[in-house]
Amino acid sequence: MSDITGTAFPQVAPGGVPDWSAMKAEDLLAYREAENRRRSSPQARAITGEPDPGATIEWQEVALPDRDLPVRVYRPVGADRADLPLVLHVHGGGFVGTAVQCDWVNSHLAAQLPALVVSVEHRLLAPDTPLSAAAADGWDALQHMLQHAAQWGIDPARTAVFGESCGALISALSAIRARDAGLHLRAQVLVNPAVDVTETMFDHASITQHADTPTLAVPQLRLFHRLAVPPGADARALSPLYADDLNGLAPALVVLPTDDPVADHGRRYAERLQAAGTPVRLAEYPETGHAFLSMPGLVPQAKAAGAEILEFLREALTA
């Protein structure tokens, strides 16, 4: 999903917003390029927040067997250590988005935990890259980091995953795969998670209650769904909400803005985690919308949520 605001677009619906239902592939690519330039601009910092000066930020590439995967790396200033905890982050924005939009929270976590925070610049949804490709990016990055822990200066025994929106879906899937592979994660943080991409995605009550919010609307979700699960894709396998077994997963913090179309996705997932015996904390932030964590300049509650995430990870990664 995406926190889309204020970018001109060639096809607009009444009210001046993008006409998601009429969007063609070439239109989406043009919009994506323009929107990600805006999110990466210095001017956007007034909304997305200033990075913590206690962390360095740089782009690197993870060399996977079949592709090079860009990642944005946040490291504590002066941390010449080989045993930092790892927080693997996956940004939101199903078909629009960039790790840069999360510099504020990720740099703060890196500086204050301290930890190495790595944000995966996953393949955004498009006709040729469905959700399964982005999910593979998240999982492959996690495996690579743990297999090359010395190269990255991390302690693989102190690892957490952290995702926002569709990035939370990717992080939740990675947590499930990690358990199945015998990898022990310390924590998972899921912020406004969209964890159902089956046909029931639109049946949750919050979809109707918050169908047209400034940062996410149902027409966007329908476009997301069309790109995420093309004909022949296994939507259930990509939906953590319907995973067969949620027992034995890393303890979870689920952060929910209440005024969000997918708020009930997070509520139902927290209920399923609890029923399965996985420790879970559900933190709801009243009168906040989708993607609020990436907008501390506009939404004061973002800083409170960031502080809660910091304390949750600090407890998990230092125990």
Language model: regions and residue ranges:
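Short beta-strand/loop motif that positions the catalytic acidic residue
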Residues: V254-L256
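Short beta-strand element of the alpha/beta-hydrolase
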Residues: D83-G93
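A glycine/proline-hinged amphipathic helix-loop "lid/cap" segment
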Residues: M1-P76, T318-A319
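Catalytic nucleophile-loop/oxyanion-hole region of alpha/beta-hydrolase
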Residues: A99, V118-R158, P296-A302
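Gly/Ala-rich beta-loop-alpha elbow adjacent to hydrolase catalytic centers
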Residues: G163, G167, S171
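Catalytic active-site module of serine/aspartate enzymes centered on a nucleophile-bearing elbow/loop
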Residues: V299-A319
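Short amphipathic alpha-helix adjacent to the substrate-entry channel of hydrolases
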Residues: V100-S119
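Hydrolase active-site cap/lid region
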Residues: I176-G232
